[in-house]
């Protein structure tokens, strides 16, 4: 029998991507930010999928995939994002490229598809996604979209997301490049007015970037800022419209939640328009409190600071009895976290700590060295940290680390279920809000319900 060496039995080339927590100040010996190893069955997605997952929540845009029908089907309604108005984004459109289009080109087919969509749906924006085939045969997406924009006098925006041209992170950048085209440039005088100290007589304005309104999350966050006297211009891209996105440059500050998917946009807006940004999270008591206080401190208004503290005192006192009740039931349980990006992973560590639970496995698909160092400092001794894990590695880690609960996305759900381990979907497929104060109560209840379910008594707990 083959002897198992290391943290998990895996391919030799994969071992550098799995390690344990390091002491603060020590460099984490973890491989990351590389292309997936061939044959390792990565959970990552392609460039196109990364772009689509960011842009899909733009509610009244038409999302047209220039490529085979499978690409459009794979990402249909991918975010689970809710809309307060029109839901054009929930219909997926494709040019359905065939072999003949590969031979003779698909530009004419794309142009005809755009004409038909404008006639039927009258959208303010059409987002046209390129796929692997488009990159290979060389269709001029830019030219077709420019001609269509002039013909129909609407934004027809190319999203340069050829799937083979990188990984999911490159898709995030392609999405941000597309969003740049939708933002209306303010006058130079307005740009010069941007300042960190906003007079109390003026209502400050912010954008929330990297929040996709999954299950309605944004609707629990925006009211908190409105109560502070701060206007939220747009949440990108959750429940957003092209009209709201066009106003993004009017903001005094950008709050960035999912830094992995949106980091390019706030950096560009800071360089281009002088709008600063702060990283923020709206999950868990500690991170919500930090987000409100840092925003209030930035604007420097004593009235805004006072309102922030009043909100925190009221809301924390309101939810603590329920959080304490759940904490008594789940205290000491072990959790495994596997997320697409590091921002969610880091905020979940704090959330589980507030519930008295221990994180024993944590991994992401797109984390960078600095992200994993921060993760390493935030978890307890013995915690396994993994980059770009495959299903077999995750399954063995869940067994070895004796996890009671796995928090991940839909692709990892069945790994946990097959092992008889409780599961909580933190990503696209959930139907309950997890952000804001009520959202954290929802999360705590779902964790409790999953761990405490009697079904686990009827299945084999360990292999």
Swiss-Prot record:
Protein name per UniProt: Nitrogenase iron-molybdenum cofactor biosynthesis protein NifE
Role: This protein may play a role in the biosynthesis of the prosthetic group of nitrogenase (FeMo cofactor).
UniProt family annotation: Belongs to the NifD/NifK/NifE/NifN family.
MF annotations from Gene Ontology: nitrogenase activity
Pathway(s) served: Cofactor biosynthesis; Fe-Mo cofactor biosynthesis
InterPro entries registered for this protein in UniProt: Nase/OxRdtase_comp1, Nase_comp1_CS, NifE, NifE-like
Source taxon at top rank: Archaea
Signal peptide (residue range): none
PROSITE patterns, sorted: NITROGENASE_1_1 (PS00699), NITROGENASE_1_2 (PS00090)
Pfam family, one: Oxidored_nitro
Gene3D superfamilies: Nitrogenase MoFe cofactor biosynthesis protein NifE, C-terminal, Nitrogenase molybdenum iron protein domain
Keywords: Nitrogen fixation
Example of a GO biological process term: nitrogen fixation
Native source species: Methanosarcina barkeri
